[in-house]
């Protein structure tokens, strides 16, 4: 099963124990303390850009498909602020990379105001099917908050 963009956010925000050499230094006690560190968001912006880390520790590109919803993406789970409920987004753009760490080619998929998706590839533009939008080459997702 391919991971989802939700899985990626879950991993990014997950708690991590800081201990030993990585322990947190408490200024009040002047000592290191073991603590859990995690990420929560107070509020999400009207435009949310999610960039996937597509490069492994060895410098090899990770071409695994990451499923991303096109409409009604709910990112409320990691919001801890005053506006927890209104975090529903629609995808309107995707950047793609073809190639490796030494070079490659970029394309963009963009949803026009007419509701249709288009691929921008250098000087060519073509209309796309929704089934083509998310691929193993997608690395940057542009979401717009629903009003």
What is the meaning of each model-derived region?
Residues 1-147:
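Exposed substrate/partner-binding surface patches
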């Amino acid at each position: 099963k391919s991971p989802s963009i939700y899985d990626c956010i879950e991993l990014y925000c997950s708690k991590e124990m800081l201990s030993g050499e990585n322990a947190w230094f408490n200024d009040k006690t002047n000592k290191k303390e073991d603590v859990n560190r995690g990420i929560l968001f107070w509020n999400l912006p009207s435009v949310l850009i999610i960039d996937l880390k597509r490069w492994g520790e060895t410098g090899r590109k990770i071409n695994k498909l990451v499923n991303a919803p096109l409409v009604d993406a709910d990112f409320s789970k990691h919001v801890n602020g005053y506006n927890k409920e209104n975090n529903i987004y629609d995808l309107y753009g995707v950047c793609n990379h073809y190639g490796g760490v030494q070079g490659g080619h970029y394309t963009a998929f963009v949803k026009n105001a007419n509701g249709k998706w288009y691929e921008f590839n250098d000087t060519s533009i073509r209309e796309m099917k929704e089934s083509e939008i998310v691929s193993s080459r997608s690395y940057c997702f542009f979401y717009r908050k629903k009003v």
